[in-house]
Amino acid sequence: MLPDNEIMIREMTMDDLDTVVEIEKECFSVPWSKQGFVDALQKNDAYYIVAVADDRVVGYCGAYGVCDEADINQVAVTEAYRRGGIGEQMVRQLLDGLIKRGYLYTTLEVRKSNAAAIALYEKLGFVSEGIRKNFYEKPTEDAVIMWKR
């Protein structure tokens, strides 16, 4: 695990997108395109952050807001930096930023087989509230719907 002072978490910028897209392709079977991230960053209701270690982006996460609810749609850390607490640091900071933006409730979907992510979200106060059948592709899998209220 890297010490907290060796990780910098900040808002995502357009300059981060080439690295973010590389991480996206590494982590997800149906990755977003660079244009998808450009579009997201241009929306007023979106909030995306990156984790920087060793002078490079090693993870990112983001959410969209509607009224007083936010939906976390991506959390990713490159393989070489996993299991070091970066995901938790990012999600904690994301949640803090969402609260400051007026979002009182936060939801997300996670692959049913992703026990590590589910455990992290539970640690951060999320509760499983349902299943979305066949939500994910490549491979097809159910999503666990989680909420933090």
Describe the function of each predicted region:
Residues 39, 113, 136:
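Positions that flank functional sites
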Residues 81-84, 133-135, 142, 149:
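Acyl-donor (CoA/ACP) binding surface of acyl/acetyltransferases
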Residues 88, 120, 141-148:
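Accessory recognition modules or surfaces
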Residues 109, 122, 127-143:
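Conserved catalytic-core motifs of GNAT/GCN5-like acyltransferases
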